[in-house]
């Protein structure tokens, strides 16, 4: 029986409870085939079809994926426009939330029926200097969900038992799915900005899948939030999520001066989640002296440009932030479990994934799309 409340479990509304109880029924009988979306070449047709159910390796768990968030990285994996080679054929997806249905022979700490999350980092060696220092994402042998390892755009997927995220019973799996990548990523980026309560942080791309969560995490961490995006709909969402000042880049005549005026000297930190090369470089101009620019979004073949004299005289920092480790994941999920983060999601069937990619390519995504693997 699914528990609806524990000491640290987020309250589950009756409708959400009903949705979960229907989706979390017995998974004892594991089928041989399943529905999934697979492509055989970059930018090739996205096939929604029957594919084999994978068998977990000794160190892996098999997860019956109920919902999966759709991330801009999934689009890059399909396009093949990053310098990192992608596995082909490939099942994308790396924000999968579901139920553990089978354990590999060496797995400890998990049991069938547990709720689990599939992250971007599917597995790492856990023995190199990066893994030992908490930088598992930088492991040279990192295995990446939906990129080098078939991901969560299928009904059953495998994940390394050490890296898989533990999700509390009673959690709405549709809403928690985006936290597994988008939430963890922006939470870690905010930590990298090294801010204190009351500081200003600018979120570039504030109303997209990453930005909408970054606004909430920043607010929950006690920061004042300035959002940069375009359009009235996005401004309304930004304000609804707790943002304070919104800058519409299509309307402002001088973004640098407008941002610096609104924040009385510039934000102490900037989180770049947009995929605009120009926006990234501009952030080095409006950030406050001694402030930190954090790079998160990954536009293909892009460079960040910072004028050297100003960079030195203003003593600004430019840092890259790449998802998060297991501790970051636990912390990000805890914010969600305490009701401090709401995922602004739209649920569609897995079969509609090509339509979601089309919207993403056109820049028409508001919040986060989540696919239901049963449809």
From Swiss-Prot:
Reactions catalysed, as given in the entry: a primary alcohol + NAD(+) = an aldehyde + NADH + H(+); a secondary alcohol + NAD(+) = a ketone + NADH + H(+); ethanol + NAD(+) = acetaldehyde + NADH + H(+); butan-1-ol + NAD(+) = butanal + NADH + H(+)
One Gene Ontology CC term in the entry: cytoplasm
Protein's GO biological process: amino acid catabolic process to alcohol via Ehrlich pathway
Sites where the protein binds Zn(2+) 1: 71, 94-95, 181
Residues bound to NAD(+): 72-73, 76, 208-210, 229, 234, 249, 296, 321, 323, 368
Cell location: Mitochondrion matrix; Mitochondrion inner membrane
Presence of the UniProt keyword Transcription in the record: no
Cofactor requirement: Zn(2+)
Extent of the transit peptide: 1-24
Cofactor: binding comment: Binds 2 Zn(2+) ions per subunit.
An MF annotation (GO) of this entry: ethanol dehydrogenase (NAD+) activity
EC numbers for this chain: 1.1.1.1
Alphabetic keyword roster: Membrane, Metal-binding, Mitochondrion, Mitochondrion inner membrane, NAD, Oxidoreductase, Transit peptide, Zinc
PROSITE patterns (UniProt xref): ADH_ZINC
Disulfide-bonded cysteines: none
Binding site for Zn(2+) 2: 125, 128, 131, 139
Function: Mitochondrial isozyme that reduces acetaldehyde to ethanol during the fermentation of glucose. Involved in the shuttling of mitochondrial reducing equivalents to the cytosol, where the redox balance is restored by NADH dehydrogenases on the external side of the mitochondrial inner membrane. Shows a high affinity for alcohols with a double bond conjugated to the alcohol group.
Family to which this protein belongs: Belongs to the zinc-containing alcohol dehydrogenase family.
Subunit comment: Homotetramer.
UniProt miscellaneous comment: Present with 11600 molecules/cell in log phase SD medium.
Name of the protein: Alcohol dehydrogenase 3, mitochondrial
UniProt source species: Saccharomyces cerevisiae (strain ATCC 204508 / S288c)
């Amino acid at each position: 029986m699914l528990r609806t409340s524990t000491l640290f479990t987020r309250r589950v509304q009756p409708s959400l409870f009903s949705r979960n109880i229907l989706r979390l029924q017995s998974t004892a009988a594991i089928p041989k085939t399943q529905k999934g979306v697979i492509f055989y070449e970059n930018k090739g047709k996205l096939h929604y079809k029957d594919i084999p159910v994978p068998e977990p390796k000794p160190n892996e768990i098999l997860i019956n994926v109920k919902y999966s968030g759709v991330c801009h990285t999934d689009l890059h994996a399909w396009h093949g426009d990053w310098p990192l080679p992608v596995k082909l054929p490939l099942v994308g997806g790396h924000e999968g939330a579901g139920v553990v249905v089978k354990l590999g022979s060496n797995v400890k700490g998990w049991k069938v029926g547990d709720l689990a999350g599939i992250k971007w980092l599917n597995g790492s060696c856990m023995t190199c200097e990066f893994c030992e220092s908490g930088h598992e994402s930088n492991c040279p042998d990192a295995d990446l969900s939906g990129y080098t390892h078939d991901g969560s755009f299928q009904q059953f997927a495998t994940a390394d038992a050490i890296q898989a995220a533990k999700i509390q019973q009673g959690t709405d799996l549709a809403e928690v799915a985006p936290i597994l990548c988008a939430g963890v990523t922006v939470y870690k980026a905010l930590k990298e900005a090294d801010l204190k309560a009351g500081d200003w942080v600018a979120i570039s791309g504030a109303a997209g899948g990453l930005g909408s969560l970054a606004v909430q995490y920043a607010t929950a961490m006690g920061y004042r939030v300035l959002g940069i995006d375009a359009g009235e709909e996005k401004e309304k969402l930004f304000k609804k999520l707790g943002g304070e000042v919104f800058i519409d880049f299509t309307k402002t005549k001088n973004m640098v001066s407008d941002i610096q005026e609104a924040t009385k000297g510039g934000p102490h930190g900037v989180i770049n989640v947009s995929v605009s090369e120009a926006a990234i470089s501009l952030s080095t101009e409006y950030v406050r002296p001694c402030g930190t620019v954090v790079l998160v979004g990954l536009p293909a073949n892009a460079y960040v440009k910072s004028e050297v004299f100003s960079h030195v005289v203003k003593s600004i920092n430019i840092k890259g932030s790449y998802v998060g480790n297991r501790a970051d994941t636990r912390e990000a999920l805890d914010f969600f479990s305490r009701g401090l983060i709401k995922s602004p999601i739209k649920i569609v069937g897995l079969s509609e994934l090509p339509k979601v990619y089309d919207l993403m390519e056109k820049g028409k995504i508001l919040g986060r799309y989540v696919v239901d693997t049963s449809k």
